[in-house]
């Protein structure tokens, strides 16, 4: 072993490296866990730099502790992630230190912290469409309007990674 680093819930199911090989994105496949972003540019000094959890919390009674990430894939500046009963999320990872969910589609009418629902989301078609497979509902073909998050939607510094002094340019 050259190096190791624990993930947020210590139950990593998958990992995907960024196109520049500097960042690793992981999913911990347990209820209430996260997609993690890690700086692996120096494998002897791995750093956790951000965690994100599917925000809709459409698990049982809307509880965040019921969301379970399954697999994430890097597609350019985005992470496309299957989330069991919460469907598919698209995360802007152009800044791996500040992961922002920009889109989601719930494939499953089911709820709760179980392993039903969306098992996979494949973003690599030449058309840009995403294929999502749901164990109970079947195949979904999703059009995803990829677009960068500009930091304009969050205004509560206590609720998000928001810098009130930051400037954005169009």
PLM regions and their residue ranges:
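Primarily marks secretory-pathway-exposed extracellular/lumenal segments that are disulfide-
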Residues: 134-136, 145-170
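Feature marking well-ordered beta-strand scaffolds used for ligand recognition
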Residues: 1-151
């Amino acid at each position: 072993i050259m190096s190791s680093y624990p993930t947020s819930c210590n139950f990593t199911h998958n990992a995907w490296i960024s196109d520049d090989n500097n960042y690793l994105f992981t999913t911990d496949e347990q209820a209430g866990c996260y997609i993690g972003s890690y700086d692996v540019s120096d494998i002897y000094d791995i750093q956790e730099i951000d965690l994100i959890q599917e925000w809709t919390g459409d698990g049982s009674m809307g509880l965040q502790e019921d969301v379970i990430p399954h697999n994430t894939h890097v597609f350019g500046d985005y992470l496309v992630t299957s989330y069991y009963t919460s469907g598919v999320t698209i995360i802007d990872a152009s800044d791996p230190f500040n992961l922002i969910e920009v889109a989601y589609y719930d494939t499953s009418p089911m709820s709760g912290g179980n392993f039903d629902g969306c098992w996979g989301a494949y973003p690599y078609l030449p058309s840009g469409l995403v294929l999502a497979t749901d164990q109970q509902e079947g195949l979904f073909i999703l059009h995803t309007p990829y677009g960068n998050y500009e930091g304009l939607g969050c205004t509560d510094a206590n609720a998000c990674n928001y810098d009130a002094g930051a400037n954005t340019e169009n």
